[in-house]
Amino acid sequence: MSTQNSEAFYGHPGGLKTLFVTEMWERMSYYGMRALLVLFMTATLQEGGLGITIASATAIYGLYTGTVYFMGLPGGWIADRLLGGQRAVWYGGIIIMFGHIVLAIPNDKTFFIGLILVILGTGLLKPNIGAMVGQLYSENDKRRDSGYAIYYMGINLGSFIGYLICGYLATDFGWHYAFGAAAIGMAAGLIQYKMTTQKLEGVGAKPVAPLSAIGQRNSWMVIVAGLVSIAVITLLTFQGVIVIDPIALAQYVAVAFTLIFVVYYAVIYFCSGLTGNEKKKLWALLLICIASACFWSGFEQAGSSLNLFARDYTDRMIGSFEIPTAWFQFSNSMFIVLLSPFFAAFWIKLGQRMVTPAYGIKCAAGLIIMASGFIVMFFAAQYAASGLQVAPGWLITTYFLHTVGELCLSPIALSAVSKLSPRRFAGQMMGVFVLTYSIGNIISGLLAGNYDPNNVEQIPALYIQISLFSIGIGIVILLVGLKSRFWEALKTEEDDTAAPVQGNNGTTTTA
């Protein structure tokens, strides 16, 4: 792909602006709704919510966020084989928009239909828009990392807007106005995308590895059959023929995703003709995958138990103004914007001093720092258990520590996947790694189910257990990382002959 473009965007190809703005509005819709999901489901019927238990609501939340990541795997495949990135992003955005429109309808059944549509649409849009950013640049273009940094800013700007607007609307006008605003945001992104698609200059216009005519026909038949199956199961559930326990379902799905991860990883390790050095690198990568799953199981408490703590036990009054509960969650976006330049400079400075911590050590540090945020919440919950409303600073401090942990782990882990995976399996390994997000998110929802506002004395135990478990795993990874750093440095035959592969199953951000 030529990187020349007559309408440059801060010195980058003009197509970056198209993808930046589209992703900004998509993330606005996603995070705006995500911040309200558990709050809406646990609100009473009189408050306009669904009135379901916290354990069920957080399990549904975990299933939703975990499945969104999982659906990126077939979404990337569909773009690579059938649609091309441009059409995948377009159709995915349309499905997301209709999902939010359905969510705006005040009906419990349409709520779950809306969630399914958002999951399907995000799975089609999210992995492919990130892959197209990379395709804007030629193989050795030094602007690539900077381009992804700009793209990442769009993600955080979108999440900030989503938390701000949807959080305000939910508090002052009602839940469904907030869901409707998410639909408007996605519509704005789609309009901009359609009007500026030409700036992509052919990037993602066609599938990169198209199937034969017969293969395409068979694939579409499988896709249609899958969608029909989802529709039938949904209908039977609404009619009471099938009864779904969201907690049990989340447990089964977490086990299923873990088994898929283990089997896929084992097949690549044992059945792919890897060299000894490649296998040792995969052992080093496995540590990072474990750290990732554990990290997200704690970090994603932001939308569930920490969100509920903000609602139930945090003093949100500033004079006569009550801070909307969802607004606390944009602390993460704000801290990422403020801290990202510092961390980028910090890693460079360490490299200049010939101090380069191993991937496993960095990820272990990120996990332990995230866990320290729950030590803060342990003390905050103890104050709440004594009958006090706690100051907002407790939650903000927790989100600060979580963000520091994220910046130590998330971009480092993605870099590790590209560095430690055998080059010929780089795209597949990124897809396997994405499963750690799914596993972590579902476990997060199950853990949050132990939050019980009617038994506030037990909440400190929830947070200290999450903290101690994460710290324990982090210490083990740190100790093993002292050995795995030698595995990470091993050379393979491909290292000197091949360039990194970027597929549609992964991007440079987890957001």
Walk through the language-model features, giving the residues of each.
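Intracellular loop-helix junctions on the cytosolic face of multi-pass helical membrane proteins
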Residues: 1-14, 139, 170-305, 312-317, ...
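Short amphipathic helix-loop junctions that connect adjacent transmembrane helices
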Residues: 35-58, 302-328
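Central cavity-lining transmembrane alpha-helices of secondary-active solute carriers
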Residues: 58-79, 126, 330-343, 439
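Glycine-rich segments within core transmembrane alpha-helices of 12-TM secondary carriers
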Residues: 68, 143-171, 178-189, 193, ...
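Conserved MFS/SLC helix-loop-helix module at the cytosolic interface between two early adjacent transmembrane helices
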Residues: 72-101, 105
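Cytoplasmic membrane-interface "Motif A"-like loop-to-helix N-cap segments
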Residues: 81-93, 278, 349-368
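C-terminal ends and interior cores of transmembrane alpha-helices
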Residues: 94-112, 364-387
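Hydrophobic core of transmembrane alpha-helices in multi-pass small-molecule transporters
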Residues: 99, 110-125, 386-408
